[in-house]
Amino acid sequence: PQKKAVVVYDTMWKSTETMANAIAEGISSTGVKVKPIHIRSSHRSDIMTDVLDAAAVVVGSPTLNNQMFPTVADVLVYMKGLKPVNKIGGAFGSYGWSGESVKQVAAELAAMKFSMIEPGPRLQYVPDGDGLAACIEYGRKIGEAVNAD
């Protein structure tokens, strides 16, 4: 894998997208190339090409009906079938009520033997200044892990 990271996410009301961009900013601040990928704006095969080429894969999902977002689940199932190796992983997301998605995404990545950087940011409603600062810091940790690898 190259010294680059992908931040793969979907969003309902832009909160998870805002988090994704802040995490990407944190990763970029460490000198690691980063590509944010909005799932519904990209073809699955193109997403996987980037995933397989990256050292770190950070996945973001809003919580919908106590679950990760369906499009995120789809990407994770497809990713699992490709058996990616030697990946640093991260999970993050936003929620309104319960917020299970982050733990669910993290569990899926851990099951694929990703070296997880935890805990990932889990923010309720619209990210505020503190929440965005936590996302930038999380991205920095991901970038540092890529540089140390």
Predicted segment positions?
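Active-site loop segments of alpha/beta catalytic cores
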Residues: 43
